[in-house]
Amino acid sequence: MGNTKTKDRQYQSNSSQPTNTSAPVLLRRQAEPSLYGRHNCRCCWFADTNLVNCSNHYLCLKCLNTMLRRSNLCDICGEELPTTIIVPVEPSAPLPGQ
């Protein structure tokens, strides 16, 4: 009776979900050093390499994938998780002449 309007609103809100338009994020092999020491993954506090910047903290790739399986929002800060990652090309050997 009166619940049909709420069901219609629920279906309309689900169909108008915005698509993911997050900007590409740079993968950091090692986080930038700061005044307060090394940066670690804010979720597991173990990983300190291959970190991705999420709003105001870093996440390792394992924790990022785990969070993306559950939803597109970060469990720590509530912001949208990065889904596009740019991997920088780093030389595997020293440049000639160095």
UniProtKB/Swiss-Prot annotation:
Q: Which SUPFAM superfamilies match?
A: RING/U-box (SSF57850)
| Annotated zinc fingers (RING-type), start-end | 41-77
Localization per Swiss-Prot or TrEMBL: Virion; Host cytoplasm, Host perinuclear region; Host cell membrane
Q: Which InterPro entries does this chain map to?
A: RING_finger_Z_arenaviridae (IPR024183), Z_RING-type_Znf_sf (IPR038485), Z_RING_Znf (IPR003224)
Q: Does the keyword Transcription regulation apply?
A: no
Q: Residues bearing covalent lipid (N-myristoyl glycine)?
A: 2
Can you name this protein? RING finger protein Z
Q: Name the domain of life this protein comes from.
A: Viruses
Gene3D superfamilies attached to this UniProt entry = 3.30.160.310
What Gene Ontology molecular function terms does this protein carry?
Answer: RNA binding; zinc ion binding
Enumerate composition-biased segments (Basic and acidic residues). Answer: 1-10
Q: What processes does the entry annotate via GO biological process terms?
A: viral budding from plasma membrane; viral budding via host ESCRT complex
Q: Which gene encodes it?
A: Z
Q: How is it modified after translation?
A: Myristoylation is required for the role of RING finger protein Z in assembly and budding.
Query: What family is it from?
Result: Belongs to the arenaviridae Z protein family.
Upper lineage: Viruses, Riboviria, Orthornavirae, Negarnaviricota, Polyploviricotina
Q: Spans of biased composition, class Polar residues?
A: 11-23
What is the role of the protein in this entry?
Plays a crucial role in virion assembly and budding. Expressed late in the virus life cycle, it acts as an inhibitor of viral transcription and RNA synthesis by interacting with the viral polymerase L. Presumably recruits the NP encapsidated genome to cellular membranes at budding sites via direct interaction with NP. Plays critical roles in the final steps of viral release by interacting with host TSG101, a member of the vacuolar protein-sorting pathway and using other cellular host proteins involved in vesicle formation pathway.
* Keyword set includes Membrane: yes
Record's bilayer topology term: Lipid-anchor
Self-association and partners? Interacts with protein NP; this interaction probably directs the encapsidated genome to budding sites. Interacts (via RING domain) with polymerase L; this interaction inhibits viral transcription and replication, Z partially blocks the product exit tunnel for the releasing nascent RNA product. Interacts with the glycoprotein complex; this interaction plays a role in virion budding. Interacts with host eIF4E; this interaction results in eIF4E reduced affinity for its substrate, the 5'-m7 G cap structure.
Swiss-Prot/TrEMBL keywords:
Host cell membrane, Host cytoplasm, Host membrane, Host-virus interaction, Lipoprotein, Membrane, Metal-binding, Myristate, Viral budding, Viral budding via the host ESCRT complexes, Viral release from host cell, Virion, Zinc, Zinc-finger
Instruction: Fetch the Pfam families from UniProt.
Output: zf-P11
List the residue ranges of the region (Disordered).
Answer: 1-26
